[in-house]
Amino acid sequence: MLGTSLSPHHENFWAVIKSYYQLTKPRIIPLLLITTAASMWIASHGHIDPVKLLITLLGGTLAAASAQTLNCIYDQDIDFSMQRTRKRPIPSGRVQPRHALIFALILGSLSFSLLMVFVNLLSACLALSGIVFYMLVYTHWLKRHHVQNIVIGGAAGSIPPLVGWAAVTGQLDWSAWILFALIFLWTPPHFWALALMIKEDYAEVEVPMLPVVKGEKITVDQIWIYTLIVVPFSLLLVFPFQASGLFYAIAALVLGAIFIQKAWELKQNPFDQSLAKSMFKYSILYMMLLCTAMVVDSLPAVHDVTALVTTTLASLT
């Protein structure tokens, strides 16, 4: 079905594969998987089942790929209108929408089946809910109609840690929801920094992103506020929930201080594209390193070292 006859724009079978791969927006997926993995490590207290980890990450990859493909189908008119996205598979004519829809449904079905059979039903349902929420709530309802689109729609990108936690424990407790909320609060400063960089593109296709509707100054003020909330919120995993320990706390404080500095610099210069780009790139690095710190902190050896340091310091006071 996915042969070279699908489109005259494809020179060979590998070009077809490349087009379908591009439909999934693969650069977005790794960050979603990192949050899933971090959640699983915390939930398992560092004793992760490698097979379950790989299956869960594969299921998450398929779910995210399905959601992104559906997004490409729905937003094909916007993509065609913007110079930056005009060469994507659907607006360029390399993939037909009906074929992309079949591809997305196959990916979503594989994700749900894989998680349900080899992990558990809760993780499968959560992954499916992420696809549905991303398409119906964010892409269809919010993105083109509401200035707070990315705030509410950010819930879709916050579901992966719930999937990871459910995969390990079969349930969702407060620590899982803290991880969900952490990513939910991180999403606006991350995405609004990007929106500042491509404001004109969004304005051209009448997508009401915050910089388009309210301007740069209000946008950077909102970025500043959310950043100030995210950093202390990240420490809730340490106290009072005690899901993470000293190593994570130190990492969260250091990474958070840099995040706040980036937001402050942008607040002082709201029209500086280089600062918006720096903020956007660092927001990705921040979340990646924060999740890495969660994983390292959960390792038994790190717990032993932390306990030794704590005991030593206590004996000196």
Curated annotation (Swiss-Prot):
Its EC number is 2.5.1.141. It is a multi-pass membrane protein. One of its GO terms (biological process) is heme O biosynthetic process. It is an enzyme of class 2 (transferase). It catalyses: heme b + (2E,6E)-farnesyl diphosphate + H2O = Fe(II)-heme o + diphosphate. The keyword Cell wall biogenesis/degradation does not apply. Keywords: Cell inner membrane, Cell membrane, Heme biosynthesis, Membrane, Transferase, Transmembrane, Transmembrane helix. InterPro entries: Protohaem_IX_farnesylTrfase (IPR006369), UbiA_prenyltransferase (IPR000537), UbiA_prenylTrfase_CS (IPR030470), UbiA_sf (IPR044878). Pathway: Porphyrin-containing compound metabolism; heme O biosynthesis; heme O from protoheme: step 1/1. GO terms for molecular function: protoheme IX farnesyltransferase activity. Converts heme B (protoheme IX) to heme O by substitution of the vinyl group on carbon 2 of heme B porphyrin ring with a hydroxyethyl farnesyl side group. Carbon 2 of the heme B porphyrin ring is defined according to the Fischer nomenclature. Belongs to the UbiA prenyltransferase family. Protoheme IX farnesyltransferase subfamily. PANTHER family: 4-HYDROXYBENZOATE SOLANESYLTRANSFERASE (PTHR43448:SF7), PROTOHEME IX FARNESYLTRANSFERASE, MITOCHONDRIAL (PTHR43448). This is Protoheme IX farnesyltransferase. It comes from Picosynechococcus sp. (strain ATCC 27264 / PCC 7002 / PR-6) (Agmenellum quadruplicatum).
